[in-house]
A protein has these predicted regions:
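Short, aromatic/His-centered strand-loop micro-motif at the edge of beta-sheets
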Residues: 131-151
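Short tryptophan-centered beta-strand motifs in secreted/extracellular beta-sheet-rich domains
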Residues: 90, 148-165
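Extracellular carbohydrate-recognition regions
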Residues: 22-53
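Secretory/extracellular carbohydrate-interaction modules
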Residues: 22-28, 67-127
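Flexible glycan-contacting loops in extracellular carbohydrate-active proteins
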Residues: 173-202
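Beta-strand-rich interaction surfaces with strong enrichment in secreted/lumenal proteins
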Residues: 74-80, 103, 138-144, 174, ...
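Hydrophobic membrane-insertion alpha-helices, especially the h-region
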Residues: 6-20
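Extracellular glycan-recognition surfaces and repeat-rich motifs
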Residues: 42-63, 67, 72, 112-113
Length: 209
């Protein structure tokens, strides 16, 4: 696979309505009383793809994800609904010097959404939580360097949203209306002439089925 020079990226973990039939060859796990599964790179590559402008490649236990030149962003979406508490755990490496990670929790009617945004800059990193475009919380104490794997945990427990990087809570907030029947995914967005790319591994997803 041809890999371009990567200068910037946006990663979006998204919640959308709808569900598709998907069978994974995965290991059953339990975390904080919630059943879950370890998702291999091969099974992750079977998730719903949003566009033909998306390039993926299984590299051992890792999945390489890249958008094509001229793309306006691509998404890899878990094709089943998630209701109630969940834990989305994985290791992520950006292949860029700057970028953003966004986690979106949207209800199944689409009338509101929460966005947890991590902005990766050369000088500092900023975490923000948005609700329907309004900033509700901001924090500045975390590290997210390119070409380094970080363990990320995105968790919803009751009305609480939490985001951890390498075991440290980066930002958290309380939802007024927790989203139901959401589907998690990963979206990357670069510049038109400089496509975004990431590598992801050790994915685990926990929720009450």
């Amino acid at each position: 696979m041809k890999k371009y020079l990567i200068l910037g990226f946006v990663v979006v973990l998204i919640g959308v309505s709808g569900a598709l039939v998907w069978q994974a060859k995965s290991s059953r796990l339990t975390l904080k009383g919630i059943s879950g599964e370890a998702i291999s790179a091969e099974d992750l590559n079977k998730w719903d793809k949003s566009s033909d402008n998306m390039q993926t490649e299984v590299q051992g236990n890792q999945l390489y994800i890249q958008e094509s030149i001229g793309s306006e962003g691509v998404a890899l979406v878990y094709p089943q609904k998630i209701s109630g508490d969940f834990i989305f755990k994985f290791k992520l490496m950006s292949l860029t010097q700057t970028g953003k990670i966004k986690i979106i929790s949207r209800n199944d009617d689409g009338d509101y959404e929460y966005i947890v945004e991590l902005q990766q800059l050369r000088s500092k990193q900023t975490a923000k939580i948005w609700r329907d475009g309004a900033l509700v919380r901001q924090a500045d104490a975390f590290t997210l360097k390119p070409d380094v794997f970080y363990q990320i945990i995105f968790e919803r427990s009751g009305r609480q949203l939490n985001l951890e990087i390498d075991g440290k809570t980066v930002i958290s907030s309380t939802e007024n209306k927790p989203a139901q029947n959401a589907t998690l995914g990963i979206r990357i967005e670069g510049r038109p002439d400089h496509p975004a790319a990431i590598e992801i591994k050790d994915v685990e997803l926990y929720y009450n089925r």
